[in-house]
Amino acid sequence: MRQFLFYFIPFSVLFSGCRNSGNVKSAEIIVFHAGSLSVPFRQLKDIYEQRNPGVKILLEPAGSLVCARKITELKKACDIMASADYFVINELLMPDYANWSIRFATNEIVIAYGEKAKYSTEINSANWMEILLRADVIYGRSDPDADPCGYRSVLTMMLAESHYKLPDLTGKMTSKNRDYIRPKEVDLVALIESNAIDYMFQYKSVAIQHNLKYIELPEEINLSDPSKADLYKTASLDIRGNKPDETIRVSGEYINYSMTIPFNAVNRERAVDFMCFILSEEGSGIFKTNGQDPIIPF
């Protein structure tokens, strides 16, 4: 049923809304979105507001799981929820708070670092694990219970453990530098720029947007290749669910971002119009410029 809603509702509702967008009135649009979407969404917001005087887009970045819990636990209204993982919308919002999601962009996990990172002249895609585990190296990651990049970082460790045949790599890495776990991946950028940490697990797009150096990881572990779906799903972990005492199991999948218009949207018509702009050729170009390959849904 969810697959049916994924394909039918976005195409019928959004396509109709895009064709009739000229009648949409001025309004305020509240957008809860993944932190890694901050740069492209600010650019989309600026262009849209210039072309639609009187419209104000309010962007609220957070970890995608936190965005979802604003709706499910805090009962906050938003017009668009944009997640770094379709899983968040499908598992935490459907069917009680939304009934469809549409995927619009991809990404990949990299190891990003700053100019003064220790051993930056040595690190590569084959030895990054050994570098990050050195006693004098500090690395950061985001919180798996708050942010998809956080649980994807752990999934990458798990896949690396198998790929490189390094027993207990995940245990060693997750027990190290726990003071440098942050609510969302973009919070780590300031730690890199201030030299508080040497390296971080990060999305490639965020590294590009902030002019950071990064090591690309093999496709077998970076969660970028849909053809490796069977391999990715061999890694899994439990994260917090909708309630503090609940957990949900998340498995490795290739990275894809999705968005929806929740049932509690106040300005649904304008939300459809802005979403159509995000999904347009121009909107897709903005994602491409910012290091993310767009998914063209129609």
Ranges and model annotations:
Residues 100, 109, 137-139:
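Generic beta-strand structural signal
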Residues 74, 78-85, 89-103:
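Short beta-strand-centered segments that line the small-molecule binding cleft or hinge
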Residues 18-52, 56, 60, 65, ...:
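Exported/periplasmic ABC-transporter solute-binding proteins
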Residues 7-14:
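Bacterial N-terminal signal peptides
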Residues 11, 106-107, 254:
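Short, solvent-exposed loop/turn segments at the edges of secondary structure
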Residues 62-68, 86-89, 109:
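Short active-site-proximal "capping" loops at secondary-structure junctions
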